[in-house]
């Protein structure tokens, strides 16, 4: 696929307790913010259990590797920030827009954003990608 500045794509996922459990099994991230409702309430800062940040960014990895730029693509660098927690049960939508395409190398710069079902941004930033294929 030839990339064009301004090209955009998105993909969505509803995050469940099972996603959080599988991610914890794979990574060992068993932070009580993801599993212990009493702990979360005691913080006084969160409404409910939150998902691991890696689940949120993982949707961006899927988007880049599958949709845009597509198969054979990896991140070279990422500069993003989490702007709000993502709760179990949220439907998040990852979006990417091509900001620049290198003239002679399979490299591009993307603007990325992840939003929850209410439209609230939960992550935003930029990333550079390299496409092997």
Which residue stretches match the model-derived regions?
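Mid-chain, well-packed structural core segment of small domains
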Residues: 66-90, 94
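Generic structural detector for well-ordered beta-strands
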Residues: 10-14, 81, 128-130
């Amino acid at each position: 696929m030839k990339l064009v500045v301004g090209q955009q794509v998105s993909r969505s996922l509803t995050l469940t307790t099972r996603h959080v459990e599988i991610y914890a099994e794979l990574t060992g991230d068993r932070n009580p913010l993801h599993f212990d409702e009493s702990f979360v309430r005691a913080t006084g800062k969160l409404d409910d259990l939150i998902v691991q940040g890696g689940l949120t960014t993982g949707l961006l990895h899927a988007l880049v590797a599958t949709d845009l730029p597509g198969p054979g693509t990896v991140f070279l660098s990422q500069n993003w920030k989490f702007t709000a927690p993502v709760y179990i049960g949220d439907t998040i939508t990852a979006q990417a827009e091509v900001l620049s395409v290198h003239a002679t190398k399979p490299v591009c710069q993307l603007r990325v954003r992840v939003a929850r079902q209410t439209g609230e941004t939960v992550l935003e930033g930029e990333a550079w990608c390299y496409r092997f294929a």
